[in-house]
């Protein structure tokens, strides 16, 4: 029988409950050290096993656009020159409502398992970050799914200010657009603080239509439209917003038309959005390869190659 699709409306609250303690301002952070993910990390884990250094590279594969995120936003915010690569200190919260087949994080680190993670405050994470020799200028709050714990961002902004390093740190986070918690949990003051800080947010579109969204996330297809609606609401906050998109899907049929419609939807939300959205090329390695062993992904990869050619043409770039 086909696997049942995830009901995001019920899954997201369950995952959130496992990884945040609002009263004590604690977040459950994955312990990368000793996990299956550590095998694919080139630099040693740090910060007591909770952190890792990521090297964000601008260069990508032939036929794909460069990945300027978060390099260009960080450089602008910090007054730095253009760069081909920038390092970031990464922490991952310990849950996600979805189970994307291509996720580089092992699924055992996505379920809010306290045996594989640690309760810490934003202040404690910033203390560990500040103590790193030659610390990266980018602090990346990842996951998991940071949108399950929206408080993490303003709490971290406050902690950076108290530590005296807010002016020379660029805070970056990703957002799966899986919840409305930014509006349900945060105060107007907290949302304004995010807009005023040296902070950027990248929202991850998990496909180009309902079918590809469900295929990629394992969640009910209506989540695709909800992603677009949530991004539209974020624009009103004034955050420095960007997008990622994954272009894999289950069927090659009418890919040109589907991607063109998606591109136009992004333009209708915000004229600049297509140029601020980076397609991520999916590859099978590490946990992704192990998780999908024996699964035929030829069509999914063919779809993304056809889709990127359309995307590049629509963005005015040679494929």
Name these PLM-found stretches.
Residues 1-47, 222, 229-319:
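Auxiliary Fe-S-binding modules of radical SAM enzymes
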Residues 10-92, 101, 105-111:
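N-terminal [4Fe-4S]-dependent radical SAM core
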Residues 30-49, 136-157, 177-187, 279-294:
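Short N-terminal secondary-structure initiator segments
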Residues 82-134, 259:
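A glycine-rich, hydrophobic loop/mini-helix early in the fold
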Residues 97, 208, 248-250:
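Short, solvent-exposed loop/turn segments at secondary-structure junctions
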Residues 107-120, 132-156, 163-226, 242:
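Core AdoMet radical
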Residues 125-128, 155-160, 189-190, 226-230, ...:
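A general structural detector for well-ordered alpha-helical segments in enzyme core domains, enriched
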Residues 162-167, 269-273:
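Short helix-capping segments at alpha-helix termini
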């Amino acid at each position: 029988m086909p696997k049942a699709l995830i009901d995001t409306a019920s899954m997201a609250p369950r995952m959130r409950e496992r990884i945040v303690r609002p009263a004590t301002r604690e977040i459950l952070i994955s312990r990368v050290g000793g996990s299956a993910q550590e095998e694919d990390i080139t630099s040693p884990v740090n910060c007591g096993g909770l952190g890792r250094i990521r090297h964000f590279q601008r260069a990508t594969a032939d036929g794909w656009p460069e990945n300027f995120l978060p390099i260009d936003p960080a450089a602008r915010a910090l007054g730095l020159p253009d760069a081909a690569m920038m390092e970031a200190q990464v922490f991952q919260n310990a849950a996600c409502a979805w189970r994307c087949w291509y996720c580089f994080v092992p699924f055992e680190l996505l379920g809010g398992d306290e045996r594989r993670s640690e309760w810490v405050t934003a202040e404690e994470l910033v203390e560990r970050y500040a103590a790193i020799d030659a610390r990266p200028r980018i602090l990346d709050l990842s996951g998991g799914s940071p949108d399950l714990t929206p408080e993490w961002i303003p709490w971290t902004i406050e902690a950076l200010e108290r530590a005296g390093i807010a002016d020379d740190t660029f805070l970056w986070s990703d957002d799966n657009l899986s919840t409305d918690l930014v509006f349900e949990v945060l105060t107007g003051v907290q949302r304004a603080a995010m807009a005023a800080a040296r902070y950027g947010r990248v929202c991850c579109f998990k496909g180009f239509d309902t079918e590809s969204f469900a295929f990629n996330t394992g969640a009910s297809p209506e989540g695709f439209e909800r992603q677009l609606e949530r991004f539209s609401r974020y624009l009103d906050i004034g955050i420095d917003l960007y997008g990622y998109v994954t272009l894999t899907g289950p069927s090659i049929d009418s890919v040109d038309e589907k991607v063109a419609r998606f591109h136009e939807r992004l333009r209708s939300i915000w004229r600049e959005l297509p140029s601020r959205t980076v397609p991520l090329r999916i590859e099978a390695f590490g946990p992704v390869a192990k998780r999908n062993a024996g699964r035929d992904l030829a069509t999914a990869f063919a779809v993304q190659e056809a889709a990127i050619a359309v995307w590049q043409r629509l963005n005015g770039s040679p494929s």
